[in-house]
Structures are given as structure tokens and as C-alpha cells.
């Protein structure tokens, strides 16, 4: 899979998220650049499952040295390798293993059920709490420490995406 052909931002206000892990999975897949394929990194040590599809924004570089992470609120899980054109609505700031690690939260741009969702204010607070709790707890049994710093709304996303695209280039 040639990731260079997948633009980070196909149009203003929309990003591409390459799915690595389908919602509901305990398997943690990662895209292996050398193999150009998805490989099983590990099975989560705890009983938690990814609440929604999870992946990364191609052709970006975040502060942790990896592409910018993203989670897509979607009703039907997709599959590893699926590219979702998504509208970012905010991001979760956290520290993972001592490094800053932002997780963009987005909705599918082509799903009419989410046409009204423009910011974190359009998502039930309990849903945001569940997502934050997933990231807080899923590494506990691996003895890895994460710290949740909080949610940033949609007005902060553009700067994060632009910075990550610039860092990649």
C-alpha cells in the first residue's frame, strides 16, 4: 500500500484516516511500513475493546514520532486498510510513555447520521468519557502509564493537523 497516495487532507475540514483497528476489537494492528501490510502488534492485555475504528492520518508526523492518531465514531466497524474521509471534531490530549500523544476524534464525512456533528459539543459527554477511559485504562495490565490531559474542541484541530503535515514534510 503506497501511503504517499493518500492525502492527509483531501479537502478543507476533512482528513483521511487509515483504519488499523476496527471498533470492538481487542487486537492491536499496526501498519508495517517495511512489509506494506497490517501486522498484529499485540492483543490488548485487558478486557477492554476499541470503542470505535482507530487508525492514523497518512503523511503526518506527530510529536511522538508516529503519524497523527485518529478515532472515528462510526456505527458499523470497517476493517484494517479502510480509508475514511472524516471530519475532525476535536482531540484528546494525553501523555503516553512520557510523550505527548494526541488522538483526533472524527466522524465520517459521508455518513448523513453524523451531518449535524460539528464539534465535541455535539457528542454526549458520557461518550467522550468512555473514549477517554479506554485510552486511560487499556495499557494498565501492560504496566504502561498514560495520563489524560483533556479534550480540545474543533477550533484547535486545524493547527494540530497543519503542524503534523508540516512536520512530515
From Swiss-Prot:
Record Gene3D superfamilies: Inorganic pyrophosphatase (3.90.80.10)
Keywords: Cytoplasm, Formylation, Hydrolase, Magnesium, Metal-binding
Compartments it resides in: Cytoplasm
Cofactor: Mg(2+)
Gene Ontology terms: biological process: phosphate-containing compound metabolic process
UniProt keyword Metal-binding present: yes
Gene Ontology cellular component list: cytoplasm
One Pfam family linked to the record: Pyrophosphatase
E.C. numbers: 3.6.1.1
Positions contributing to substrate binding: 28, 42, 54, 138
Keyword Lipid metabolism: no
Record's catalysed reaction(s): diphosphate + H2O = 2 phosphate + H(+)
Ligand binding (Mg(2+) 1): 64, 69, 101
Cofactor binding note of this UniProt entry: In the presence of Zn(2+), Mn(2+), Cu(2+), Fe(2+) or Co(2+) ions, activity is very low. In the absence of metal ions, there is no activity.
GO molecular function, one term: inorganic diphosphate phosphatase activity
Taxonomic superkingdom: Bacteria
Annotated InterPro entries: Pyrophosphatase, Pyrophosphatase_sf
N-formylmethionine sites (modified residues): 1
Record: residues binding Mg(2+) 2: 69
Primary location group: cytoplasm
Function as written in the Swiss-Prot or TrEMBL entry: Catalyzes the hydrolysis of inorganic pyrophosphate (PPi) forming two phosphate ions.
Subunit structure: Homohexamer.
Record family assignment: Belongs to the PPase family.
Designated name of the protein: Inorganic pyrophosphatase
Species this protein is from: Nostoc sp. (strain PCC 7120 / SAG 25.82 / UTEX 2576)
Gene field: ppa
